[in-house]
Structures are given as C-alpha cells and as structure tokens.
Amino acid sequence: MDVIAMDKKNILILSTGDVNGAYEAAYKVAHIIKNMGHDVVMCVKHKTKNENFIKQYRHLSLSSAKANLVMRIVNKIKNKISPVEPSKVISTDMKYSFLSKNEASENIHIESMLKIVGFTPDFVFTGMTIDFLNSTDMLNIYNATKAKIYNITVDMNHFTGGCHYSWGCEGYIKGCGKYCPAITKEHEKITAKNNFERKYENAQKANFQIIAGSGLTLLQAQNSKIYKSQKTIHNINSLIDTKLLNSKNKSIAKKVFSLSNDCFYILTGAQNMEDPRKGFSYLLQALEMLDIELPMQKKEKIVLLVVSNSVNEEFGRVTFKKQKIDYIKDYRLLSLLYQAADLFINTSIEDSGPMMVSEALACGTPVVGFDTGILTNMVIDDYNGYKAPVMDSRKLAEGIRKVFELNKDDYENFSKNAVRQVEEFSSYEYAEEIFKQILEQ
C-alpha cells in the first residue's frame, strides 16, 4: 500500500450510469481502484448513487469569451475538413443491440468534463458509455490529457461497428463492410462500415487498450481487428465482492426463504426473460427432457426458482414445482438466495456475462449453462458445474442431471470449487492485482 501511495494516480472512470449491469461494473472498478489509494472520479451522464467521487457530467459555460471564440473557430475548421452529419435514427434488428449510431460525432465538451472532474487524469477506464460519449470523444480526451485509455468489454461494442452482440457476424474480426446484418435498410448499412473505420482510426491514434470482462470477450478482443495487436489483454471476470457474495451462510440460507432441506432447488433468471439472448426456450426443452427421463420420486424433489421482472409465459408448461421470486436488488438478500439454491442455470446464447454466473459460484452454488460469456472460463466440467454447447438442450439436461445426482461429498467439493474459482479469478482482490499491473506501467 505504501508503494501505491507514493505513486498515486489520477483515475477517471467513464460510464453512462452508476447502477445495474454494465454500469455497476464501472462502479465496482472505481471502488477497487479507489481502495488501492488512488484519486478516483467516476463521471456519468446519469447519477443515482450518493457517493461524492461520482460526478455528473454537464456542459459548463467557459468563463473566458476568448476561449469560446477559439473553440468555435476550431470546430468550424474541423467541420469544413471533415463534416459530421447529425446522428439519425437507423433501422436495426433489435437482437444485435446496434446502439452506436455515429462514431464521428462529438458529444461532450472536454474542458467542461475536466473542470467537473477536478484533475487531469493519468488513466481513463470506460465501460458502457452509450448515449454519453464515443471513441471520438475518447480521442479528444486523450489529445487534451495524454492519459492512458482502457476500454472494458462489458459487451462487444468497443470493437464493433456499432452492435453490442455479433450473433456470429465476423465484422469485428475482418472490419465491418457494406453488408451489416444488424442494419435492416440497405442504404443505411454503410453506417457500420463508417463507424468501424472511425473506431479503428481513433484507437490507433490514442493507443486505446482493452480489458476483457469475461472469457468470451477476451477471445473476441484477441481476434478483433482493432485490438488483436495488443500484447496482453487482462480479464477481470465480472468483479465479485466476496465480502457480500460468499458461502458463509449456506447452512441457514434455505430457512430464510422457507425452503425445504429435502428439495433440490434450481435457480435461474434475468431482468427480462423475454430477451432472445437469454435462451430460456432451451431451458424449457431441457426440463421437458428431464421430466420424461427422471423417475417420479426424483422429479418430486426438484423445484424451479425463477427470478425476473417478467417471466416467460411458456414457463407455465413446466411440470416441475416452480416458484417465482421478484427481482432482487439488495446484494445481501441475493447472496442468501444463491446460497439457498442447489444449482444455478444460465441459458444465455449470446451474452458477454452474465454476472449472475460468477455471483452464484461465489456463493458456493454449482452452475450449468451454455459455453459462452462468463461460463467459458469460470465453469469447469466435473469441477464446479457443467458447460453445454450453445443451444444444445440435450447436453444442458445432462449437465443438470449430473449435478442433481451428485452424492453429498461430491456436491460439497463442487461447491467449494465454485467459491475457489471466484476467489482466484473474479474477486476484488484478483482485480486489484490486475489494476496494479496496469497502473504501474
């Protein structure tokens, strides 16, 4: 700690928001680096949390009229050299989450941001910044500060032409061309090509670096045209606070939710189960297979716990006992729910996470799911769960049955291994070591 204190850095974290999913990940990064002894400001478009280190961006009027005049002249020259068209609504296939409409636009005033932040950053870390800033804004920040810039892959957007999920498209590997499956109107498809080329150009000029948020996005970043030449790509694997999410109360967790010790509880869920990326139809198929194959005395022990804001209507046809639980935001209660469950299932077919996988493992709950996202390197067959090929309901059912039929000692080993995997590759302590390496460069 003394070494870090002697070489204290100014760190800027950029994110559209500070709560939920990808925004929560940026908040965790801010906390980890702040606890390492550095000066940290998290600048967001929408502020929800009360912490003082989180500051909301707003455009400030420059005190000097002369400075305003200079900026107007500079912008006028820029627009003459390279005109920037205003962002427009384009027609897209929603499953790709093509949200970056214009990488050439400038969305923030750098002097305003630096004045709000209160220092010139040495390092900048960005997560999800949709509807806030883009790679051109990041280049402008670099030009003004010469800070080292790291983009964190909460999804694929940092190295695509605009989509957050590729669904098999290899544009991020080759460079987005005139054909883009995410954009539905022919004359608008050029948007992806223009975005990608601007992103690539900006990354080269400012030497952007990437940090992976999961095993899958690590592989994708390593193959991407924009970041394939980066020598080392670190992977922070979700970032789990093991002081909150752990297995210390596993022996009493079922009592908290009035669950029976004689039943086997399968936990699954998402904020929106209707999202096709989450692949819940494959879980339904796997459960139907188990319904046919398991003898009645075993089937009666299985209870499905579903956590979601909205439950897919098709879950009504599941014959196993089931119980809906409202989406939980309190991490202490969520930790107890994970500990109360005997198995967590993730059926995402196109996902960079989800964080729920690492959260469940941290609480000593084995995981079964498709080999994508965070499962790629956090779930190990016959160790802490099972991985099935994406969209393979048969293999998914087999993985569920294997965990269900583990004897007590083998299950205990799976549970301990789940915790160990998070402590070694997904904990705050693990992430701190990674950020220490980065900040000491």
Q: Language-model segments: which ranges?
A:
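Conserved acidic donor-binding segment of nucleotide-sugar-dependent glycosyltransferases
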Residues: 381-382, 386-393, 402-408
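Nucleotide-activated donor-binding/catalytic signature segment of Leloir-type glycosyltransferases, i.e.
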Residues: 298-301, 306-335
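Aromatic "clamp/platform" in nucleotide-sugar-dependent glycosyltransferases that forms part
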Residues: 349
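Conserved donor-binding/catalytic core segment of Leloir-type glycosyltransferases
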Residues: 259-278, 284-287
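Short hydrophobic beta-strand element within catalytic cores of glycosyltransferases
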Residues: 366-369, 379
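A charged, aromatic-enriched C-terminal amphipathic alpha-helix characteristic of glycosyltransferases
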Residues: 412-439
